[in-house]
Amino acid sequence: MTMSNLHPGFILIAVGLIALFVPKSLRRPVLAAGPLLGLGAVLTLAPGTNATLPFINGITLHYLHVDALSWIFALIFCMMAAIGGIYACHNSNRMEAFCSMTYAGSALGVTLAQDWLTLIFFSELMAATSLFLIWCKKTPASRQAGYRYLLMHMFGGNLLLAGIFLKVSAGDYLVMPLAQGPWDTAFWLICLGISINAAVVPLHAWLVDAYPEGTVTGSVFLSSFTTKVAVYCLIRIFAGTDFLIWFGVLMALYGACYAIMENDMRRLLSYHIVSQVGFMVAGVGLGTAMALNGATAHAFSHILYKSLLFMCAGAIIYATGIRKINQLGGLAKKMPFTFWCFVIAALSISGVPLFNGFISKSITISAAAAAHYGSVELLLQLAGVGTFLSIALKMIYFIFLAPDNGVVIKREVPKNMYVAMGIGATLCVLYGVYPELLYRYLPFTMEPYHPFTVDHITQSIEMLGMAMLPFMMYLPKMAPHTALSLDTDWFYRKPFAGIVTGLSYLCCAVSRALGNTWEVLYEKSMELSHNPMEFLDAKPLRNSSKYNPENYRTSIADPIMITLTILFCSLCYFMAII
């Protein structure tokens, strides 16, 4: 393996392993400089680079495949790993350092995989390592949110795994587009599995539940990888699947509306992950070269400005210990650098001209107009208004500009966090002013796109003005307040809690009615468990002169179905009690 085909994901995983074992004095330079090696490896990868590994039964693992699409996602993932490493290098938690780098490396593993088995391996590694970024906070809320996160990703991972098994059993080992059909069982299983990772509404509640409970540094990584890896997979596998258009529009509006009602900083930002990923999913559904480039560009931009928003929120929580917006105020004077970085990130996510969100979001909206989806164009613009209202206006005013609530800066923010925030803010402005730095690497051929036309700029200013006027008119009513907002997880957590309670009462009633008979049934069932086929068969072959191991052998489908049934029941149970 030479530098020209060195897998950058392996480098990041190695950085994580080193950070796990070295003393704290060496961990800081490892986290700060290690990801730069991965970034260098990405820059040396040329389109067409491939690397394989022989596997069992003549199967070959294509663990490294580089084309224009995988390269640009690998680039931004390594850039984010480097920024996140700088932001987190003051952290003394070696497990968190290991999981964050391995998580980023696994995201690269999925991105550069060309076969289904490699993809599912790194996808599951992503789920496992991201879980510990939530649990590393070590609070009851993070532990419970982590369990719910685990159960949802077990469910989604098993759907994806089942679909991949169907593809592999049919001899389809390589990751190929599925949108053109057939829309068979494998298609739907893989689509559902990826949709859970993409937080497609109504399968999104795990994200808003878990990401705010991560550590200050861990949430920065969480906001950057899982959903964007899912977007990459959707572009690669399901481009042009038209029903995704409307799911994307629903996500964009749903996330923006719920964000307006939120009082918790990181929950609000998490809802906007759902909203912004909706733009990408809609672009995937449109399926044109322009729309797919828009989805790719917006994923690139989103990672930069969303991570910057989470870094700023993390700095506020680190300094003050406060997460609720209504408990903050007057921080512009107390944390001026954080304030200006937040302003840049807020203007970027709102799609204000000269910031990177504008040069990417406008491509998807223009693609919808070009494809004659006028309603999609309008609804996505309305979602942009909601974004500007809840982040650029609500968060900036009530956190930084509102009268001081007596917030005390309990500890100084480490300099490395400021450095990472400064890098993120610089990139948001740089790509916004010079969009060709991004456009030249977009993977699909399309007509030259110029974002800074009079029409685009005027339309953007008009839409943002629509949000500013009502905010100023109804400022007292826009003040955040503590309230319970029910999300889609209520529909499975509340009913299943009743089901679990009812089943518990039923089991107790049956146990009391049976009395000693219950013990007899238990003993018989234990005897039966040693040879369940003896119960299913009318008469075993007792007189057979020779032992035949095939007598009681059942199809492999039976234990698989039993296992999946147990997993599903366990999922329902734990969702109800957690």
Predicted regions and their residues:
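Short aromatic-rich membrane-water interface segments that cap or initiate transmembrane helices
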Residues: 57-73, 180-187, 367-380, 449-456
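Alpha-helical transmembrane segments and their membrane-interface junctions
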Residues: 348-363, 425-446, 517-524, 570-576
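Hydrophobic transmembrane alpha-helices and their helix-loop junctions in integral membrane proteins
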Residues: 83-119, 128-413, 433
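Transmembrane helix-loop-helix hairpins at membrane boundaries of multipass inner-membrane proteins
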Residues: 1-98, 172-173, 177-178, 494-497
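Alpha-helical transmembrane segments and their helix-start/interface "positive-inside/aromatic belt" motifs
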Residues: 24-35, 144-151, 333-341, 411-423, ...
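Membrane-interface helix termini and inter-helical loops of multi-pass transporters
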Residues: 50-64, 170-180, 235-237, 361-368, ...
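Aromatic-capped, Gly/Pro-kinked transmembrane alpha-helices
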Residues: 440-454, 478-578
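Hard-cation-handling environments
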Residues: 411-466
